[in-house]
Every structure is written in structure tokens, then in C-alpha cells.
Amino acid sequence: MSSPRQTPLHEIHEALGATFTEFAGWRMPLRYTGDAAEHNAVRTAAGLFDLTHMGEIRISGPQAPEALDYALVANASAITVGRARYTMICNSEGGVLDDLIVYRLGEQEYLVVANAANAAVVSAELAERVARFEASHEDVSDDYALIAVQGPKAVDILAPLTSTDLSTVKYYAGYRSEVAGARVMLARTGYTGEDGFELFTSPADAPAVWQALADSGAEHGLRPAGLSCRDTLRLEAGMPLYGNELSAELTPFHANLGRVVKLDKPGDFVGKAPLAAAAEKPTERKLVGLRTDQRRAPRHGYRVLDAGGAEIGVVTSGAPSPTLGHPIAMAYVDRDHAEPGTALQVDIRGTAVPVEVVALPFYRRNA
């Protein structure tokens, strides 16, 4: 068995005292000082993340827009240069293979960013799907390190390091720039529910970019942040995680994300027919939020019960919420039990713990 890969920032993480975990073949920082402190820093100031384990695939050529229109559920042709789109790649039955962000870097050039655990699958699927078009596929994951600065102080931290006027960088914009003298692809995207930026830079430049951000952020309360708090941040924001809320057995419509499926775009795309059928028929189960005032948190895989104790769903993600002060969870439940305010229970190791259905997201930042 091969050893996990290390990011270009590994020595920095070690010096910061990080606790590591192996994830998707990478040795990644799980936490530095503590989950709650890192989580709260992102909500109130800013956190600095190493996300180099994500996968990047470049699609380019005269028919790159048409190729991605066919390969993904998005209308890639409609993405303007310098903007990004949240989308999904589905199988022929409409099941989700991964959720993605697609950046349009030029008229004939896109960068597709895949989740680490699915990067190889996404790259292989894209290679096969774009082969029928006048477009090329290149897995460029090794060309990039990915650093994210997330939180309400992100603009204050990044602004002194770039000549780009950050007030002009809209949410879900992404284009080439410079940060701390390094060439980057600067994107106003993230997975925390806060404002922030993701910086795609070369592995060689990554340590200097990280250190420049850390130095600039020192006066603003910036903390290095690990994958553990990233999970509680995205949970509070109601953002899905592949393998939990999303899978090849579920369509985007199951996860309340039917809006990303562009059935009206020109031409065919992989999964179009079953997705069109799914759009016309409500799913049997719906993704909902759950909250409880009890001490123990519902966790992935726990059974959801109705008031009489009958099983009516399953928890997909759950944790104590540092921001809200009580446990929260997302779960798939039968539609007739999905209305906010519905009283349900979760079987937590043999104990039926009362929970209430609530609307998603649990947390929404102030604009």
C-alpha cells in the first residue's frame, strides 16, 4: 500500500502542530488547535485552509463549451469568461458522480474542480465524454496547490497582497491574478457559508502564498483551519457532502438541488432523460435539517423515527453546531414527515432522541 501524498504545505502544517488524517490518498491537516476555535474563527474573522487534495481538470479547445454541456448537467456554454458555476456530473441513470465547480477561464478553456475522493473518477469520465468533441482533456491536479481564506475578514487579509480590486470580484467569479507576487487563479468561492477566496497557485509558490496570508491575517484574527471544522462549517451552511447527502444512487433532485440541472439547454447530455423524468415526480424522501436540544448529536447512518418509533429516514451528516450551540443534522426523511416543525426522533445507540425538522440552511451569513 502506497504512503499518502503530502501537500506542498506539509512542513508548515507540522510546524503549526497540526493533527493529520489520511483522506483520499492524502495526508491532510485535520485540526491545529481545536475544532471549535477554528470553526469560530471562520465565522467571526477568517480561517486559512490547505485544499490541495482537490482535483483539477482542464477542458479546452474549439468545442470545449459543447463538450461540457454534454458531460455535465450545467449549461457550460452560458458561463461567461471569468465566472464559475456549481454543478454536477451524473451517470446515465441521473445519479450523482460528484458535485463540481466549473470555472470558465477563456472562450475555449474551462477548469473543472472535483472533490478529492472522486477526482480520478471525474477525470476518467470527462476524458471519455469529451473525446467525441473537438476538445481536449488534461488532468492538471499536480500543477496546482489550493489555498482558501474564508471568513468575514477575508477581503481585509487578501487585499494588501494583490493588485486586484476585490470589490469587483463577484461571488462565483474566478480569473487569473497575482497574490504575494505569485501567479494565481483567484476565485470568490468556498465551502463554509462565509465570504472568502480560493487561490489556485503552483506547488512551488504555495508556501510563500500561505505565509503571506498568515502574516497579513495576524492582526485580523486569522487561524489555520483543518478539515474537521470545514465539515461543521459546511453542515451549518446546509452544503452537501458527497458520500453523505450525494451519491450515485441519488439524483440532484433528492438533495433539493434540481436547480443545477439545466434541462432546457440545447442538445443532449449524460443522464438527461432520467433527470427529466425525476423533475416531474417528487422524490419519496426529502433532504431536511434536524435540530435537537439534547446533548448527543445525530451522526451519519443513524435511523430517523417518527413519533411512534417507525423508521422513516436516515441521518446523512450530524454534529454539534459551534455557532448555534446545539446539535444539528441533515437527513433524508419520507416526504410526509419533512415539514419544518415536525417532531421526530433519532435512534442514537438505542436511545430515541427527540429532534425537530427545520429549514435548511441552519446558518446564513449576513450580507
From Swiss-Prot:
UniProt entry tagged with the keyword Membrane: no
Keywords recorded for this protein, A-Z: Aminotransferase, Transferase
GO molecular function: aminomethyltransferase activity; transaminase activity
Role this protein plays: The glycine cleavage system catalyzes the degradation of glycine.
Enzyme class: transferase
Biological process per Gene Ontology, one example term: glycine decarboxylation via glycine cleavage system
Domain of life, per lineage: Bacteria
Family: Belongs to the GcvT family.
E.C. code: 2.1.2.10
Quaternary structure annotation from Swiss-Prot or TrEMBL: The glycine cleavage system is composed of four proteins: P, T, L and H.
The name this protein goes by in its record: Aminomethyltransferase
Record organism: Saccharopolyspora erythraea (strain ATCC 11635 / DSM 40517 / JCM 4748 / NBRC 13426 / NCIMB 8594 / NRRL 2338)
Catalytic activity annotation: N(6)-[(R)-S(8)-aminomethyldihydrolipoyl]-L-lysyl-[protein] + (6S)-5,6,7,8-tetrahydrofolate = N(6)-[(R)-dihydrolipoyl]-L-lysyl-[protein] + (6R)-5,10-methylene-5,6,7,8-tetrahydrofolate + NH4(+)
Entry keyword annotation includes Transferase: yes
SUPFAM superfamilies: Aminomethyltransferase beta-barrel domain, Folate-binding domain
Pfam families assigned: GCV_T (PF01571), GCV_T_C (PF08669)
GO cellular component, one term: glycine cleavage complex
InterPro entries, per the entry: GCS_T (IPR006223), GCS_T_bac (IPR022903), GCST_C (IPR013977), GCV_T_N (IPR006222), GcvT/YgfZ/DmdA (IPR028896), GcvT/YgfZ_C (IPR029043), TrmE/GcvT_dom1 (IPR027266)
